[in-house]
Amino acid sequence: MTAASQISMSARHLGYTRGGPDVPVESLKITNELLQKNHDELHIFFRDMNGHNHLVHNLFTRLALGATPEQLRTAFNDDLPTQRGIPSLDQDVVDKMHDDDFFSERITKINHYNNFMVFFEKEIASKGWQTVVNQYIFSKSRVAEALLPLMYDGAYHPIIHLGLGVEFEQPAVIAEALAQAAAHDSFDTDWFFQSAEQGALESQSGASPSSSESTLLELARETAQDNTIRDAARTPGLIGTMKMKKAIYPKAGKQLLSLASRFRVTKETLKQKTAEMVNFCAYLAGCAQRRDRATKVDFFFMHCVTSSLCLSVLAQQPWIDIADRVRLIEWKGRLDLAWYVTCGVPDLDLDHVKTYQAGVERGWDDIFALVSDQHDDGHVAKFVRALKHGEDICQQFEDGDASKAFPIRGDMWQVIARMAYDSTLNLPPPAKWVIMAGMDQAWVSVPEK
């Protein structure tokens, strides 16, 4: 066992957005114990297709928000029954993974998750986790160019895992994240990102005014007005990443790429564009409602929000070259647009947030306490913490030239957090969220107002 295979949380590394100044020693102890068990014994996929193990996300987030030892153990036990054991290790395979051809042949093969993880643990023990992340994610080698798009696959789960590992400075979790990306199915995110980059380069070199840079809010509005995109977005019978791959890209890929390539980031605008991306995700989550139905947050927009915090963390890392950080945020914003389309281009109305009645007025500390006590697999807690982070980084852009790109402001962040908490409390997982909010069928089982 190496340091790169051990979970070792400390009071010095408790994340960017926290629920209080002090975390009990017992909370740290139980988190280390439970996450070590997860690391050693459990698969990062509880099923082969998009079955993502959320235990790390759940415990890190609840710890940061101030959960008690009892709440942390309950959170772990709530989600444990759905998990499965880690695949067997093949040391011969691990030893051969330094060969890029051998490694590349095994990318997207879920049965190699444990082999990938142990390989990355050894690499981290030898080189340090920052060096390994740069080598395998940002070096633009053949392997890195395969793994980086996979980080965004599966509704952002691998990059959420990586962002948390970096935020809490846990090499073992970073090894898990790299292995998850390497073992993950591809849903053609590589094609989407590469095509969008090529489109951006071509428009910059020749360029009509229509290809100029735009905000995510402007691009979403144009997306909703494109008939080809709308027709693809309303394709029935598919959900999530499979719909993106099988319906959106084939039917409206050209039109979507033309718009997505206009979201651009530079080293000078990185901070502002990161905040814009975070704000846009919150806007999607809060505003995609139906006037005749009870409030619900879209399941995939929730993941856009959750991952926005992790991308913000990565965008602030000085050991990642700024050009790579720019690329991270460009890709995130572009894929958020693709998720808006995949979810059926729902109407987005800020009045749903402005007029939401949350009942008792509560501050962030009260909301953190509520979600820490909620029986949930961590989705609500992650969503709420990401919203608080959004409030923190977007406030400086609420006034001035960029303000139109920041519709979520003031107490709206807390309101959206309460929308998620109120609409998921004491409900079974299938009833907590609406799945693809632009589709009429998604709202059939949601109670009328």
UniProtKB/Swiss-Prot annotation:
Keywords: Oxidoreductase. Induction: The expression of the dibenzodioxocinones biosynthesis cluster is positively regulated by the transcription factor dibT. The keyword Oxidoreductase applies. GO terms for molecular function: oxidoreductase activity. InterPro entries: Questin_oxidase-like. Pathway: Secondary metabolite biosynthesis. Its EC number is 1.-.-.-. It is an enzyme of class 1 (oxidoreductase). Belongs to the questin oxidase family. Baeyer-Villiger oxidase; part of the gene cluster that mediates the biosynthesis of dibenzodioxocinones such as pestalotiollide B, a novel class of inhibitors against cholesterol ester transfer protein (CEPT). The biosynthesis initiates from condensation of acetate and malonate units catalyzed by the non-reducing PKS pks8/GME11356. Pks8/GME11356 lacks a thioesterase (TE) domain, which is important to the cyclizing of the third ring of atrochrysone carboxylic acid, and the esterase GME11355 might play the role of TE and catalyzes the cyclization reaction of the C ring. PANTHER family: BAEYER-VILLIGER OXIDASE MDPL (PTHR35870:SF7), PROTEIN, PUTATIVE (AFU_ORTHOLOGUE AFUA_5G03330)-RELATED (PTHR35870). This is Baeyer-Villiger oxidase GME11358. It comes from Pestalotiopsis microspora.
